[in-house]
Amino acid sequence: TSKEYLHSLAQTGLAKRFNNQIPAKYQERLDYELKVINEMGFDDYFLIVWDVMNFAHSVNITTGPGRGSAAGSLVSYALRITEVDPIEYNLLFERFLNPARQQMPDIDLDIPDNRRDEVIKYMFEKYGMNHAAQILTFGTLAAKQVLKDVCRVFGLNKVETYRWLDAIPHSKGKITLAEAYQKSKELQLLVNTNELSKILFATAEHLENLPRHYSIHAAGLVITDDSLAEIVGLQAGPLGIPVTQQTKLNVESLGLLKIDFLGLRNLTILGNIVAALRADGIDIDPNRIPLDDQETLALFQRGDTDAVFQFESDGIKRVLEQLHPDSFEDIVAVNALYRPGPMNNIDHFINRKHGKERVQYPDPSLKKILGTTYGVLVYQEQVMQTAQVLAGFSLGEADLLRRAMSKKNADVIQRERAKFIEGAIKLGRKKETAEKVYDYIA
């Protein structure tokens, strides 16, 4: 059966990781994960992902070490779907697959961009055109594009059109026509020039965000047991490969199995380096390079990280130079902090590491959880562990809280607050402490 086959593969794989001497806590975690996977009906899903990764490894395709919550699965680690030991790095299985949240697991696979087609071809050859398809995606009419299209339909010449387009203020992120109108005096003058201009702008606002064209999702592939044509509308894509007529979100809501194959240029570079070394008689496995390698850490300390995935921007290089990371954990923390929201804590993290600011914890019981990050909340796993330790949440309950916080779901956050405080009081915490900690993690 699928259950027995997955169990056999995972057990054998984990034994290889530990030279046939599996520590007790790893065996316990593996058994727990396999039980949850089976109870949720996902044995076949893991076998499908294992199979394609096994193919990639068999033809020397360099794959990523693991992305997102899938790195929290010891089964994934045992099957070589990921290369990250979740127990060593305190990664939580419940963040990936939560029995309290009936949802398909989501494993994204990183593949070199110059060999992604080989993997896609393998999937279609294995499962057939009736059971696999790429996914449709829509390009929508953003502010400038919709304004340009409407100007053309209204018969404006190029000079007039670009007057309208130049009136849209520059913005780092996406800007709507309504926001542009509020910010741009020039746009306000154009709109109010005459009645036709008002109609033109109103028409553009009406059409904004509607689909303009369709293309193929850059990464997603759908696989089904039954014939896909019986489940979802299909159309022919490039080279005759079928494409769903439903978008990624709709495909997921139908409960279809979706796997993302992400083509990364950085893995192509890495694969080329490994191949060049092999040609010179040097056999190297990037996954076996020690994470405390001093020469590599020195590169990060200098911010010398061109072509290093997610460390290429000038901003993150400056953070690396200021932090002067002396461990792999420091590098991981920078990657987690360098994004909107958590960026506010970068200075605290740097100053505390260098002893310029006192390390503080919302409650002494959190030192074990926040100690490696100098009292700064960096990872979503830390939110889950805090809810477990301070308020007695199960990790499944803690994951639901984490999701509400990451999606800024105010109703759920407020509802969980009362539950958190009540649980903390039952464990002997003071109400003021519980409130302080909840406000900190929320």
Region locations from a protein language model:
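Alpha-helical scaffold/interaction cores of sigma-54-like transcription cofactors
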Residues: T1-A442
